[in-house]
């Protein structure tokens, strides 16, 4: 029951009234209307009073207040009933429907739009693009259908002139995935004639008043509704409709839905063609019927994609087939006018049906496999014309009111009859509540062979000329004694009925007088085949698809089509069966006054609606009855998890006993009754309490299941990881063994080969053995080197080590390292190198050995040296394991300077073929020399030998020696930095130092 509203607003639920009487009901309804509370509950039924003004109660904030809430938690609202239908559909996977009923102008169409708005707002929390697209198109379809199916009447500015039932399909998550729209009985007669003060369909005015000038010119239209016969009745009538703005909104909606530009243009052409058809006038010249304004025919032909002579022939002649002969029968003026109007009505009806089908093509649910996507559920929303009583009521009003009788019958059967019958069947104590059952009125209309529709069909099928008077006579004869039928002939004293024209039906909503004038023609719904062929042969493909029967041959005999009333009756029976298969929710709309005033509450008018809608009886049944009932096994299946007595399964003798024990255990036994097969729960609060407890337990069970499932997944994952690691371990072992076998196979016997396996290509190792292969290659290289070296004489081994040291320090940096020649070491002691002075050098060397006690002479050579005065001198260098001696070859190799070898920190050379060497000293007195520049011996490359000998010696003594290859070479002399560059000269025979600003330049021969 509704809460959170103060007593100053009256009772939010009529069930809470102190006494169930009509005066108290009306007093509460009036109070709530005056306080701006237009919605009131009757249990799970919403009573809605049209406020005739915009209220700020439909925004996003209001939607959030009702989302996921139970009925009793919030004040009465359309959103509450919409949410209840949505939750029922989602919780129980059962199709639901919302039936909106009430008379014309009671606010049914607006109610349906707010319900659609709410459903769209609360779904698709994950913002899936496809769901958003479907929601948008469902909402936009309302705008389009209102434009082409609604009109202004004297009772309603936006009256639905057709019946609409929309199914919204939801996936298993509760998100809309599509829908389907069914339309019923478009009031197409409104196209050609409207009652005083009423309008044609909105679409005509929207196009005339809202279309751009260029569009109007292409349609041969003027921005003047009084220029067209079919809209002229509104010329001086003021309307609250914003037609120009609505035109843009409808055009945009059609684009969003998916109408192609050429399809939208065709729609405008059809509307324009209908307006021009209405302006066609016929005249009689002797026995010939002619068209007075022939130019209009050309315009119509152009708009419909046909030739003007074909249009003219269809309007003036009717093709009749007699056997094999085909003749053209000319119309009289009356027949021509009838044919023109019938053609205009048919075109508009086909257009409307095509629009509905076009929308359905877009929003229909595509075929889905229920095993993959889950079961689709449906919420149906019925927005259909309300009960109508006009000054002149014809076949359209008769069908509309019959529709309302069927819906009232459904309400009675589901809410009143079936509910009370179920209580008696289940053995629940119950005091019967009387109500008016309108089945007798439904039978009066639809009964086979005896009902009004059957009698109307019989009249239409009779051979010869049958008039409306003859139909009325048949009604009087067959139904004269029926309690709900009357006519002037049946009741001669009733002067409100005109003789041979009117009959009265006592509907559940009141007495309605119908005029039989036009019943026969409207029921036959005659449209000459010539018009169908004309449209089928149109060059416009959209128009062609609207008239498929136009392809039939002129001489082909066709089956008599069902009449308009029978088609409508069949569709209503199917609709009611469809609604009865779903769980219904009701919105009962009430019209507060006839003046469309937001402040006036016409108590007499409202009381009449309350009475014929059966709202008071609804309150009595709801107050005395039960809000919820369910068979025992399904009840247990949903709620057994709440109690330990029933979870996971009970051991009691029957489900009924288990349910009784369950309700006692939950402390809710006071609000339940137990039938033979079902449990009945009186108040919604008890049901909501069960739902809350179930939701709480679901969380615990879900967590428990998640724990078990996550544990299972973790164990499975652990097993897979262990299995994977085992496989990986064995695979690695296999790869290692395969690799080692391949290495052993390839290097088998390399010890006996000439190059010790240098030519053998190493196999590609597994990733895990890459570092191992690098180490193995190092071991192999050391072994191969040992194999090569061990065959050398002991005296050659130091030279080999020196060459290795030179290679390690100069590889990739210097072009010529002299590795291919034999290294002499002490070139000054060589007779070949120093034939004239070698004895002098040997003598000086022996003297120094005795003096300095060195163990080994490493290197000696003539050099060109730059002294401290930046002068170039010929000198010799002698390097032992202890000192670096600088000697003067001109003075019998007199020692000029002796530098301890530990004072040498590094040497620098260039990358070219020159013999420039810089000895870097720790005291910054670097020695700059060019090897082999004395002119006493052949010129060759000794840089590699010098670097190798020194590097190998320093390595053996575990001292660092920095070897630098650069150009220019940077050095320091007497504390100053200088730079030495090397350049090549063609016409120079010997290397030569020259002074420059930065230091020195060494010029070397080109060859």
UniProtKB/Swiss-Prot annotation:
Q: Where in the cell is it found?
A: Cytoplasm; Perikaryon; Cell projection, Dendrite; Early endosome
Q: Which residues form the TH1 domain?
A: 812-1006
> What is one GO biological process annotated to this record?
protein transport
Q: Which UniProt keywords apply?
A: Actin-binding, ATP-binding, Calmodulin-binding, Cell projection, Cytoplasm, Developmental protein, Endosome, Motor protein, Myosin, Nucleotide-binding, Protein transport, Repeat, Transport
Question: Could you state a single Gene Ontology molecular function term?
Answer: ATP binding
Question: Could you say what a knockout of this gene produces?
Answer: Morpholino knockdown of the protein at the four cell stage disrupts body left-right asymmetry at the level of the heart, gall bladder and gut. The left-right organizer, a transient ciliated epithelium of the gastrocoel roof plate, displays abnormally short cilia and disruption of the normal cilia orientation toward the posterior pole of cells, leading to disordered flow direction and reduced flow velocity.
Q: Where is the IQ domain?
A: 699-719, 721-741
Q: Is rRNA processing found in the keyword set?
A: no
Q: Which GO terms describe its cellular component?
A: actin cytoskeleton; cell cortex; cytoplasm; dendrite; early endosome; microvillus; myosin complex; perikaryon
SUPFAM superfamilies in the record, alphabetically?
Answer: P-loop containing nucleoside triphosphate hydrolases
Q: Which Pfam families match?
A: Myosin_head (PF00063), Myosin_TH1 (PF06017)
Positions of the UniProt region annotated as Actin-binding: 572-594
Q: For binding ATP, which residues are annotated in this chain's numbering? A: 102-109
**Domain (Myosin motor) ranges:** 9-695
Sum up the protein's function in the record's words.
Unconventional myosin that functions as an actin-based motor protein with ATPase activity. Plays an important role in the establishment of left-right asymmetry during embryonic development. Required for normal cilia orientation, and for normal, directed flow at the transient ciliated epithelium that functions as a left-right organizer during embryogenesis. Plays a role in endosomal protein trafficking, and especially in the transfer of cargo proteins from early to recycling endosomes.
The free-text domain note is: Binds a calmodulin chain via each of the two IQ domains. IQ domain 1 mediates interaction with calmodulin both in the presence and in the absence of Ca(2+). IQ domain 2 mediates interaction with calmodulin in the presence of Ca(2+). The TH1 domain is required for activity in complementing zebrafish defects in Kupffer's vesicle lumen size.
Record family assignment: Belongs to the TRAFAC class myosin-kinesin ATPase superfamily. Myosin family.
The record describes its quaternary structure and partners as: Interacts (via the two IQ motifs) with calmodulin. Interacts with F-actin.
Mind telling me what this protein is named?
Answer: Unconventional myosin-Id
**What species does this protein belong to?**
Xenopus laevis
**Gene name on record?**
myo1d
């Amino acid at each position: 029951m509704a809460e959170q509203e103060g007593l100053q607003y009256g009772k939010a639920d009529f069930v809470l009234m102190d006494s169930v009487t009509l005066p108290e009901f009306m007093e509460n309804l009036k109070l709530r209307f005056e306080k701006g509370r237009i919605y009131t509950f009757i249990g799970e039924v919403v009573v809605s009073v049209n406020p005739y003004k915009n209220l700020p109660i439909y925004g996003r904030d209001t939607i959030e207040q009702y989302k996921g809430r139970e009925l009793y938690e919030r004040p009465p609202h359309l959103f509450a009933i919409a949410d209840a239908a949505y939750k029922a559909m989602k919780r129980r996977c059962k199709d639901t429907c919302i039936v909106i009923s009430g008379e014309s102008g009671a606010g049914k169409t607006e109610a349906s739009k707010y319900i659609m708005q709410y459903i769209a707002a609360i779904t698709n929390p994950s913002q899936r693009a496809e769901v958003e697209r479907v929601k948008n198109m469902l909402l936009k379809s309302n705008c389009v259908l209102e434009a082409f199916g609604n009109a202004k009447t004297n009772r309603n500015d936006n009256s639905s002139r057709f019946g609409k039932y929309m199914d919204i399909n939801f996936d298993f998550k509760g998100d809309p995935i599509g829908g389907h729209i069914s339309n019923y009985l478009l009031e197409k007669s409104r196209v050609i004639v409207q009652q005083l003060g009423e309008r044609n369909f909105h679409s005509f005015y929207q196009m005339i008043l809202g279309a751009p000038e260029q569009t109007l010119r292409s349609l041969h239209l003027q921005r003047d509704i009084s220029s067209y016969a079919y809209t002229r009745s509104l010329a001086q009538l003021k309307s609250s409709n914003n037609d120009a703005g609505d035109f843009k909104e409808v055009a945009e909606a059609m684009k969003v839905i998916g109408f192609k530009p050429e399809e939208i243009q065709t729609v405008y052409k059809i509307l324009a063609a209908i307006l021009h058809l209405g302006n066609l006038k016929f005249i009689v010249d002797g026995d010939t019927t002619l068209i007075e304004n022939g130019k209009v025919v050309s315009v119509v032909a152009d708009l419909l994609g046909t030739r003007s002579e074909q249009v003219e022939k269809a309007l003036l002649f009717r093709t009749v087939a007699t056997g094999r002969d085909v003749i053209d029968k000319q119309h009289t003026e009356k027949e021509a006018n009838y044919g023109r109007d019938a053609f205009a009505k048919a075109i508009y009806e086909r257009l409307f049906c095509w629009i509905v089908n076009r929308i359905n093509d877009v929003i229909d649910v595509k075929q889905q496999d229920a095993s993959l996507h889950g079961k689709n559920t449906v919420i149906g929303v019925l927005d259909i014309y309300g009960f109508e009583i006009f000054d002149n009521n014809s076949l359209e009003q008769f069908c509309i009111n019959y529709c309302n009788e069927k819906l009232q019958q459904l309400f009675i059967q589901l809410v009143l009859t079936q509910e009370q019958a179920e209580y008696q069947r289940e053995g629940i104590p119950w005091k019967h509540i009387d109500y008016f059952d309108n089945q007798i009125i439904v039978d009066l209309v639809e009964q086979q062979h005896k009902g009004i529709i059957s009698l109307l069909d019989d009249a239409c099928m009779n051979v010869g000329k049958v008039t409306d008077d003859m139909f009325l006579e048949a009604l009087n004869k067959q139904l004269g004694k029926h309690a709900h039928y009357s006519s002037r002939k049946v009741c001669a004293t009733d002067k409100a009925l005109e003789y041979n024209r009117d009959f009265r039906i006592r509907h559940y909503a009141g007495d309605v007088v119908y005029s039989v004038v036009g019943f026969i023609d409207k029921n036959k719904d005659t449209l000459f085949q010539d018009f169908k062929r004309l449209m089928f042969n149109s060059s416009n493909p959209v128009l062609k698809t609207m008239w498929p029967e136009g392809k039939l041959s002129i001489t082909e005999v066709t089956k008599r089509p069902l009449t308009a009333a029978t088609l409508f009756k069949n569709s209503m029976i199917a609709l009611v069966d469809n609604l009865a298969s779903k769980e219904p929710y009701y919105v009962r709309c009430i019209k507060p006054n006839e003046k469309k005033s937001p402040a006036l509450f016409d108590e007499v008018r409202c009381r009449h609606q309350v009475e014929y809608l059966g709202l008071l009886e609804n309150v009595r049944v709801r107050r005395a009855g039960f809000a919820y009932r369910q068979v025992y096994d399904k009840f247990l299946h949903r709620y057994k998890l709440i109690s330990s007595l029933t979870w996971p399964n009970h051991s009691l003798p029957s489900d009924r006993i288990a349910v009784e024990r369950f309700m006692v255990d939950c402390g809710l036994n006071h609000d339940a009754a137990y039938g033979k097969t079902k449990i009945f729960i009186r108040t919604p609060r008890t049901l909501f309490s069960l739902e809350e407890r179930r939701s709480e337990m679901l969380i615990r069970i879900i967590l428990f299941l998640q724990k078990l499932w996550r544990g299972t997944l973790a164990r499975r994952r652990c097993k897979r990881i262990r299995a994977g690691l085992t496989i990986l371990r064995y695979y690695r072992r296999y790869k290692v063994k395969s690799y080692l076998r391949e290495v052993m196979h390839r290097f088998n016997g390399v010890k006996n080969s000439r190059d010790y396996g240098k030519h053998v290509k190493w196999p590609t190792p597994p990733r895990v053995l890459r570092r191992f292969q690098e180490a193995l290659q190092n071991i192999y290289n050391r072994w191969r080197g040992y194999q090569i070296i061990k065959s050398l004489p002991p005296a050659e081994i130091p030279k080999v080590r020196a060459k290795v040291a030179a290679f390690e320090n100069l590889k990739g940096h210097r072009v010529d390292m002299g590795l291919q020649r034999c290294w002499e070491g002490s070139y000054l002691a060589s007779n070949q190198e120093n034939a004239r002075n070698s004895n002098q050098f040997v003598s000086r060397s022996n003297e120094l050995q005795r003096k300095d006690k060195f163990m080994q002479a490493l290197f000696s050579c003539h050099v060109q040296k730059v002294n401290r005065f930046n002068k170039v001198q010929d000198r010799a260098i002698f390097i032992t394991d202890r000192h670096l001696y600088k000697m003067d070859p001109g003075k019998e190799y007199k020692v000029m300077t002796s530098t301890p070898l530990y004072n040498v920190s590094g040497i620098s050379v260039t990358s070219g073929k020159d013999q420039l060497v810089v000895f870097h000293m720790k005291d910054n007195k670097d020695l700059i020399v060019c090897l082999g520049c004395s002119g006493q011996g052949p010129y060759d490359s000794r840089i590699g030998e010098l670097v190798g000998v020194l590097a190998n010696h320093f390595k053996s003594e575990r001292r660092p020696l920095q070897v630098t290859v650069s150009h220019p070479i940077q050095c320091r002399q007497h504390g100053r930095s200088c730079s030495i560059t090397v350049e090549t000269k063609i016409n120079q025979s010997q290397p030569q130092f020259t002074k420059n600003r930065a230091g020195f330049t060494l010029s070397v021969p080109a060859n």
